[in-house]
């Protein structure tokens, strides 16, 4: 439990110390944000900061960070180091800068921002790459929840039914103004996720289960360690739990709803 506690403290310290350093590098100011200058009642809508945080939290803490960290834990104490240092120095920095760059560029998505500086060809390549990734991730994010819901209703509603329901929800959430579905439902899901995280944390400190310590060594404890070495498999398994460039596709959604650049660190980092 000592290593686990130190890792938690390191993540908190990383936000306040290194996060503040990155914020000073970017230098947020008091200029008007796209939510105010380009308000359209659909995508560009000012939202409360707490709600933006909840939505962004849910955008980041999806299937990847949760299941990835669980699978990555099989590799032993090395996963502690990758999650902590990867999050502080790579993942959080990337997500913060991606969101702030969008905030500075009229809420544009990354392909459009890239096109400003690297030209039309690069923008089109990034658009194509993003579309492919969105299709792959979208398929997983439809099939995954549908499969879990189908297990809860094995005698009445099958996987196909839940795929249709989840897919329909995604379509409506995409087409309707951001404050109608995403702004109302996402914070509820985020509260549920935070409640579960706090519950697990309390359980760990109440029951004191045996957890590996960093001084026990960094050996690969995966059951199939020969076929699945720490490098590169652990880094791929815990990609979203430490760094994932794909998160940058979500940050512009909330950059279009922020009313101050100074809210960037608590929202994105």
Annotate each predicted stretch with a short phrase.
Residues 77-83, 112, 116-131, 257-269:
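Membrane-interface alpha-helices at helix entry/exit sites of multi-pass transporters
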Residues 101, 112, 141-153, 167-189:
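Membrane-water interface regions at transmembrane-helix termini and the short interhelical loops
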Residues 117-118, 124-125, 188-203:
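Small-residue-rich segments of transmembrane alpha-helices in multi-pass membrane proteins
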């Amino acid at each position: 439990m000592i290593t686990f506690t130190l890792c938690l403290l390191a993540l908190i310290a990383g936000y306040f110390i290194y996060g503040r350093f990155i914020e000073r590098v970017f230098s947020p100011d008091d200029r008007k944000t796209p939510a105010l200058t380009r308000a359209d009642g659909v995508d560009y809508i000012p939202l409360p900061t707490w709600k933006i945080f909840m939505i962004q939290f849910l955008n980041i803490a999806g299937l990847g960070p949760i299941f990835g960290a669980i699978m990555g834990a099989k590799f032993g104490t090395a996963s502690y180091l990758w999650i902590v240092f990867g999050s502080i120095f790579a993942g959080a920095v990337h997500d913060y800068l991606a969101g702030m760059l969008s905030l500075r560029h009229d809420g544009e998505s990354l392909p459009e921002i890239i096109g400003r500086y690297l030209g039309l060809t690069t923008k089109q390549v990034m658009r194509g790459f993003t579309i492919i990734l969105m299709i792959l991730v979208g398929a997983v994010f439809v099939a995954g929840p549908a499969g879990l819901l189908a297990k809860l209703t094995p005698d009445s509603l099958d996987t196909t039914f839940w795929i249709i329901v989840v897919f329909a929800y995604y379509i409506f959430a995409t087409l309707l103004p951001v404050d109608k579905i995403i702004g109302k439902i996402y914070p509820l899901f985020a509260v549920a996720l935070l409640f579960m995280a706090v519950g697990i944390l309390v359980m760990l400190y109440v029951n004191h289960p045996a957890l590996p310590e960093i001084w026990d060594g960094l050996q690969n404890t995966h059951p199939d360690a020969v076929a699945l070495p720490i490098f590169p498999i652990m880094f791929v398994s815990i990609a979203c739990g430490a760094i994932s460039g794909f998160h940058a596709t979500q940050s512009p959604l909330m950059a279009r709803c922020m009313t101050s650049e100074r809210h960037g660190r608590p929202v994105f980092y």
